[in-house]
């Protein structure tokens, strides 16, 4: 076995885990600034090691399985969520990657579609009313936003002519950012990504004021830590894919706009309240779907001309 190849293939995942830790610190700092308070500042210099302290604390705590829970699925759900979120990073469009998926766009759609299964499994296996309601919301929400998201990919693929995220990014280097002709599509994409990652104002799956903590209310210790890492890994993945699809070009541009989108998620969380659940359903089925159908027709006509 070529151990060098194994180590090289593991490095990106280690980088993702480190990025998640520092992203949580960045989020807490930005939220503190917006709320006019200090934020984490005690652990190491300016609190820079706070995420690792929190992770160590969670992993050292006992992982409690509720008496009425279904033990197998309850333990498997966090691992499934983390595996699915890390699998998406294989599609990350960097030039030094050894594997490029020819149908990366389709694979990304599959990954985002099956990501809800981990939430569904945890909610059902917990045997808690709050967890089950969170899982049911996640399933209905997933069906609602994935249809407009499919039309978004259709528009981007039609403009670039390829299904690889790497090629979509490179295509924009020679012409222009897809953000310019597809600004409406990008707006719908950002709404879909907020719903996909269960972030405010679409954080119905957790809904602290309604469901205590939603699907993960019964999790503690390492199980909760793994779920937390999976959630924030998905946020960073959504940021980098957004940058590659609409602000592609060289790696520096993709990295810069990835940070912009990542900060956007935090600012939206601090700025907007949670909507009513029926408002999201109405938005997806009556507004976003109609907008994307119209946009798809316009893109087909313009590309054909």
Swiss-Prot record:
Name of protein: NADH-ubiquinone oxidoreductase chain 1
Topology class, membrane: Multi-pass membrane protein
InterPro entries, per database record: NADH_UbQ_OxRdtase_su1/FPO (IPR001694), NADH_UbQ_OxRdtase_su1_CS (IPR018086)
TM spans (from-to): 3-23, 71-91, 99-119, 145-165, 175-195, 221-241, 246-266, 285-305
Pfam families assigned to the protein according to its UniProt record, in alphabetical order: NADHdh
Gene Ontology MF: a single term: NADH dehydrogenase (ubiquinone) activity
Enzyme class: translocase
Cellular localization per UniProt: Mitochondrion inner membrane
